[in-house]
A protein has these predicted regions:
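Extreme N-terminal "head/tail" segments of very large remodeling/mechanoenzyme assemblies
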Residues: 1-135
């Protein structure tokens, strides 16, 4: 499996939509992610793990902790990862359960966790458990 593109929104230290084009790193298969403490290195790996498996790495972090503390109710929490597996491209999108702005009024409502996996042939698998099983 080779990650191609990662889009993170409202996730960990990434409040605003952030896109990381992993294809530009080349096809050598070895990447080095560096940065200051607190700059978001671990969050990148958590986002990839969450996109693929619906969970995060580490004993000290849980899915309920991944929403950015900087995100307002108008900002969604979601991760989108495209990846190559055996020469075919897949796209997975996931969001955890979180509080978002209600469609009517000024209140908030619960956004339920969800996932969508788009297969190379264009077919779509929906639902967190089904997507995790398919991956």
């Amino acid at each position: 499996m080779r990650p191609l593109n990662l889009v993170i929104t409202g996730f960990g230290t990434y409040c605003n939509r952030t896109e990381i084009n992993l294809e530009q790193l080349g096809s050598q298969g070895l990447y080095l992610i560096t940065g200051d403490t607190g700059s978001g290195k671990t969050t990148i790996f958590d986002a990839i793990t969450y996109a693929l498996y619906g969970d995060v790495n580490g004993e000290n972090r849980t899915v309920s902790m991944i929403r950015s503390t900087f995100a307002t109710p108008d900002i969604p929490t979601e991760v989108e990862l495209s990846f190559d597996y055996r020469g075919k491209t897949y796209l997975v999108k996931r969001n955890p359960e979180y509080e978002r702005r209600a469609l009517r009024g000024n209140s908030t409502t619960k956004q339920l966790a969800d996932a969508i996996l788009t297969m190379p042939d264009g077919s779509v698998i929906t639902g967190s458990e089904k997507v995790t099983s398919a991956i």
